[in-house]
Curated annotation (Swiss-Prot):
Listed GO MF terms: rRNA binding; structural constituent of ribosome; tRNA binding
Cellular-component GO terms for this entry: large ribosomal subunit
Assembly, per entry: Part of the 50S ribosomal subunit.
Function: Binds directly to 23S rRNA. The L1 stalk is quite mobile in the ribosome, and is involved in E site tRNA release.
Name of the protein: Large ribosomal subunit protein uL1
Pfam family, one: Ribosomal_L1
Annotated family: Belongs to the universal ribosomal protein uL1 family.
Record-linked PANTHER family: 54S RIBOSOMAL PROTEIN L1, MITOCHONDRIAL, LARGE RIBOSOMAL SUBUNIT PROTEIN UL1M
Organism expressing this protein natively: Borrelia turicatae (strain 91E135)
NCBIfam families xref list: rplA_bact
Biological process annotations from GO: regulation of translation; translation
Keywords of this entry: Repressor, Ribonucleoprotein, Ribosomal protein, RNA-binding, rRNA-binding, Translation regulation, tRNA-binding
């Protein structure tokens, strides 16, 4: 939805586009200029200085959760399938579940697989890849530690990744949350992101950071 209209313009007029705001001031300002009734999500957009061969992708567990619990689907057999069920996975299976997904089933938010299942799960690449759900070692979703992985996902472990333009868009809270909790989530995300700086990158890693609410204008963050 395009961000336009009188209320948006009024909100935009309160943002100094030439200023970089501290994270505390940015969160406060976004709440001050809020003009919709629903509980907006607070997002950050990070512009990275990356080369074409660079990939930035990882996961983070935010200290203050705000999203609904993810529906976890696990591809596993035998004892590992039972481990996944006991850990709280919503959907667990092997060949039958693979065929179900091939048939159009998509009522899940995250996919985990044991290594021995990947030969068959790989055939779902066109389906899962399109949604960014293909199991991957970098996101710890190809694993034999199903109990630990599922527990982490249920606590809110969330993936972040740079797109082809070197931009990461990531949600850090809701407008209804305490400012300090939003800040703690932001700080944790940035801490984990900085660990993913490519080893051969010269110069600045983070070019700029902006914060915005769902319907509101963006605010530039003073990132040092």
């Amino acid at each position: 939805m395009a961000k336009s209209g009188k209320k948006y313009i009024q909100a935009l007029s309160k943002v100094d586009k030439l200023k970089s705001y501290s994270i505390d001031d940015a969160i406060s300002l976004l709440k001050e200029i809020k003009f919709v009734k629903f509980d907006e999500t607070i997002d950050v957009s990070v512009n990275l200085n990356l080369k074409k061969n660079h990939t930035v992708r990882d996961t983070v567990v935010l200290p203050n959760q705000f999203m609904r619990e993810k529906r976890i689907l696990v591809f596993a057999k035998g004892d590992k399938a039972e481990e996944a069920r006991e850990a709280g996975a919503v959907y667990v299976g092997d060949d039958d579940l693979i065929n179900k997904v091939k048939g159009g089933f998509s009522d899940f938010d995250v996919v985990v697989a044991t290594p021995d299942m990947m030969k068959d799960v790989g055939k779902l690449g066109p389906i899962l890849g399109k949604r960014g759900l293909m199991p991957n070692p970098k996101t710890q979703t190809i694993t034999n530690d199903l109990k630990g992985t599922i527990a982490s996902l249920k606590k809110g472990r969330t993936e972040f990744r740079a797109n082809k333009n070197g931009v990461i868009n990531f949600s850090v809270g809701k407008s209804s949350m305490d400012n300090n909790k939003v800040k703690e989530n932001y700080d944790e995300f940035i801490k984990e992101l900085l660990k993913r700086r490519p080893s051969d990158l010269k110069g600045t890693f983070v070019d700029s950071v902006y914060m915005s609410s769902t319907m509101g204008p963006s605010v530039k963050i003073d990132f040092v």
